């Protein structure tokens, strides 16, 4: 392979585009995307494109760079120990997600264990961005004068991925002053690094676990947070209190998380608190950002009405697909209240409140299915059912009122326990072309009933995996770190991680770093194999960008129009029975519970086949083709 050029970085001046190779040898299988490859209609629509929340953020990139620059440090490599990066000694894996994975590490300067989130700049999954998104972004960059030469699809996706990371770091840098938010320490990057390294505080118990054999089981993780008299209700109340404080802080900062779920809530044994993590999908109110734009408020409202997050945790006001007559979301902070309600319901009932065989059936149930039968007079239970999971957003409790209820022990609701809002029992139906189309499909398929005890199969597919809990010494000694942390073997009854693997090699993520330092060994190991090995470890339920995500069914219905790479399978075809990470199942008694969620909600085996309906000779079905086209436009653009 010929010498490689500089790789784009979080801080653009570290690797100016003029010094970068736009087409690399490992990307020759993917033809470059050029303006001539686009249709005239696309060029026309681009010239008339409305400003968006994303484009306004892009136009103010210098302000964002000024805010994140103090937290981004250049990578250096020790010439004696290849298992270190800067001051961090890297240890065992702590889990993986759709876009990267986390390693346990020890900071010699801080004298404590930290978490290092490693995000490859080149997306693992080529389906992460559609061809339309990539072409639109290239055209935008050209129109702004940011690029002057043709660019390959892979190079464009790399830059888009870096922008996504930049936004997440920007958000995390503004949210560092609350104990219930995972604290950003710093980020590491280099023009020779294939990955971005985000360093945060270590949460020793990992992601919030909720799936258990029996509804009344108490998970070992819970007992380390609630020390005395731990029960399902006391633990759920603890999570509610901690998350309420976290959301109150986000509200004060003008931040809407948009992806609250168990896998984005981390538990720390030392502080005995739950913390919110992963701000890649969040947005900030225009008033809270350090720049302004005449179109910002309108763009913000349009962004709020895009489906972002994990299907089972999405609020009903976002589930009205295809109805473009009005915006259903006016208070973005109540999206987070609903998602928190779903999370608490999972803890209380050991199941999701709404789930279907595919995401559209899930959306249908979120809108239509009532939870009134779950009201039982219990204060915590009814607070969750009647106030957090209130379908009518105008009646759903606000974060300010939730704080008051928890701090003053106010009554849950002025209404009788046996009552529930009319919107929850008989929600208003808003007919649109997409809703009409899927209504027909679901009618033809026939609805399948799921009994309470038959929930396990669906529930596991509906949840994201849980980061393993890893024990460390409270005061780890630097000299014996390799034995106390890097080679630790936690109690198998408490943890589900594969911890016997070797420490990560920095050479897997740095390309020809030694070209600028002859005293260092040659570090030219490519990380493609590492990325390939980790592809099956990814969670498929997270957002794909800071501003918009394509759900798996959207990726599926694009059919032939997605970027392709040799050796890559679309995530729709991934095996659902194969574990999604090297995490091991936790054995409880004679039964096994896998809180890692090997199968994901969106990867339903009975996902809808659009081609079968489009190609059908049935006249009734063919009438829906226009509705399909309407949805395809919605899937790519977030609007009709």
UniProtKB/Swiss-Prot annotation:
Domain named Protein kinase: residues: 88-420
Cofactor: Mg(2+)
Gene Ontology biological process: budding cell bud growth; cell morphogenesis; cellular response to glucose starvation; maltose metabolic process; mitotic cytokinesis; protein localization to septin ring; pseudohyphal growth; regulation of cell cycle
Keyword Lyase: no
Record InterPro entries: Kinase-like_dom_sf, Prot_kinase_dom, Ser/Thr_kinase_AS
Basic and acidic residues compositional bias, start-end: 530-541
Positions of the catalytic residues: 259 (proton acceptor)
PROSITE patterns: PROTEIN_KINASE_DOM, PROTEIN_KINASE_ST
Composition skew (Low complexity), residue ranges: 35-47
Function in brief: Important role in G1 events required for bud emergence and septin organization. Coordinates cell growth and cell division at G2/M, essential for efficient cytokinesis and for regulation of SWE1.
Name this polypeptide is given: Serine/threonine-protein kinase ELM1
């Amino acid at each position: 392979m010929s010498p490689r050029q500089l790789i784009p970085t979080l801080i653009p001046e570290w690797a100016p585009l003029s010094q970068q190779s736009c087409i690399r040898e490992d990307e020759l299988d993917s033809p470059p995307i050029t303006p001539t490859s686009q249709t005239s209609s696309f060029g026309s629509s681009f010239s008339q494109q409305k400003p968006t929340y994303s484009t306004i953020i892009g136009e103010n990139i210098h302000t964002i760079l000024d805010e994140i620059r103090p937290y981004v440090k250049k990578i250096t490599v020790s010439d004696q120990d290849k298992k270190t990066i800067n001051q961090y000694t890297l240890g065992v894996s702590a889990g993986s997600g759709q876009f990267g994975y986390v390693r346990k590490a020890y900071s010699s300067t801080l004298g404590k264990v930290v978490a290092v989130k490693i995000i490859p700049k080149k997306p693992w999954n080529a389906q992460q961005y559609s061809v339309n998104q990539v072409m639109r972004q290239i055209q935008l960059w050209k129109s702004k004068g940011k690029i002057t030469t043709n660019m390959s699809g892979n190079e464009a996706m790399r830059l888009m991925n870096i922008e996504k990371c930049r936004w997440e770091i920007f958000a995390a840098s503004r949210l560092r002053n609350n104990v219930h938010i995972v604290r950003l320490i710093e980020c590491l990057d280099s023009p020779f690094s294939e990955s971005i390294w985000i360093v945060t505080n270590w949460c020793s118990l990992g992601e919030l676990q909720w799936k258990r054999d029996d509804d009344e089981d108490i998970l070992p993780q819970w007992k380390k947070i609630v020390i005395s008299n731990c029960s399902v209700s006391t633990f759920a109340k603890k999570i509610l209190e901690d998350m309420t404080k976290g959301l109150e802080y986000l509200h004060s900062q003008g931040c809407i998380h948009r992806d609250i779920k168990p896998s984005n809530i981390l538990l720390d044994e030392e502080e005995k608190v739950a913390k919110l993590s992963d701000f890649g999908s969040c947005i900030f109110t225009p008033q809270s950002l350090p720049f302004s734009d005449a179109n910002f408020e309108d763009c913000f409202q349009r962004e709020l009405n895009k489906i972002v997050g994990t299907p089972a945790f999405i609020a009903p006001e976002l589930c009205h697909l295809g109805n473009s007559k009005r915006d259903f979301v006016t208070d973005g902070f109540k999206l987070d209240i609903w998602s928190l309600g779903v999370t608490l319901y999972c803890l209380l009932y050991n199941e999701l409140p709404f789930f279907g065989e595919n995401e559209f059936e899930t959306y249908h149930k979120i809108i239509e299915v009532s939870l009134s039968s779950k009201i039982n007079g219990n204060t915590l239970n009814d607070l969750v059912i009647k106030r957090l999971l209130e379908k009518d957003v105008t009646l759903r409790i606000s974060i300010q009122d939730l704080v008051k209820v928890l701090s003053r022990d106010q009554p849950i609701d002025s209404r009788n326990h046996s009552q529930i809002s009319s919107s929850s029992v008989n929600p208003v139906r808003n007919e649109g072309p997409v809703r009409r189309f899927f209504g027909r499909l679901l009618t033809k398929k026939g609805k399948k009933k799921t009994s309470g005890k038959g929930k396990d199969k669906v529930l596991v597919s509906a949840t994201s995996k849980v980061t393993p809990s890893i024990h460390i010494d409270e005061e780890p000694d630097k000299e014996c770190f390799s034995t106390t942390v890097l080679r630790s073997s936690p109690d198998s009854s408490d943890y589900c991680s594969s911890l016997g693997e070797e420490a990560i090699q920095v050479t897997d993520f740095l390309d020809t770093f030694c070209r600028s330092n002859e005293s260092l060994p040659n570090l030219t190991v490519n990380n493609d194999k590492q990325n390939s090995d980790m592809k099956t470890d990814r969670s498929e339920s997270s957002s794909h960008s800071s501003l918009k995500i394509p759900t798996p069914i959207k990726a599926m219905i694009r059919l032939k129009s997605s970027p392709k790479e040799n050796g890559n399978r679309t995530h729709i075809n991934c095996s659902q029975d194969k574990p999604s990470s090297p995490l091991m199942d936790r054995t409880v008694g004679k039964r096994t519970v896998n809180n890692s969620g090997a199968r994901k909600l969106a990867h339903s085996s009975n996902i809808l086949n659009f081609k079968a309906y489009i190609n059908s000779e049935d006249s009734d079905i063919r009438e829906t083709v226009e509705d399909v086209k309407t949805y395809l436009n919605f899937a790519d653009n977030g609007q009709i």
